[in-house]
Amino acid sequence: AVMATDGPLLILAGAGSGKTRVLTHRTAYLIEECGVNPYNIMAITFTNKAAGEMRERIDQMVGYGSESIWVCTFHSTCVRILRRYIDRLGFGTNFTIYDSDDQKTLMKDICKRLEIDTKMYKEKMFLSAISSAKDELIDPIEFETRAAGDYVKRKQAQVYREYQQALKQNNALDFDDLIMKTVELFKLDKEVLASYQDRFRYIMVDEYQDTNTAQFELI
């Protein structure tokens, strides 16, 4: 697996069998044996802890030049890209990232403004529906189209639309937006997409089986 460097490769093995070690050794092999520039390699993980551990291992194995390799989570990868190019989607590059408390506060305001009975329709329910939609790359317009005939879904669609408008007015993204907006950017701007495709010739994803639709599309 370490020496299979051309085309896609999926590694299936049990927990603790060394899948992550394969990624770090493959990175070293690409640089030392295949002459690949570290600048052209990306390694993606799901958690900051896993990214930190992988970064440490790669630094130890590769040494000089390893700082050019992108070793980060899906979300931190997207933040780096969006900080450079999100202005092409009508946001400022100094956008704020909303945490769960910010989201709850915003949702409370929206429900109040739309006069929604939050005893019957919980704010948490709306946030969960919006998060699930974003994981599937479903924007408010498509959500509304799919909601036809279902009262609760139509209510969710209305809230989703208001929620996204409020985020944009506040120059803010929530956690799920980070991936969704990066995919949107790549679809909208072929020049930006091409620059990253040209840079990252070798992309390795740890725990790939856990990717959702948005993460899969991003890769």
Where are the model-predicted features located?
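Conserved RecA-like helicase ATPase core segment
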Residues: K19, L23, A28-Y29, T213-I219
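Walker A/P-loop
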Residues: D6-R26
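Pre-Walker A adenine-sensing motif
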Residues: A1-M3
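Conserved Walker B
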Residues: A15, F200-T211, Q215
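A basic/glycine-biased coupling hinge at the interface between accessory DNA-binding modules
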Residues: D6-L9, A28-Y202, T213
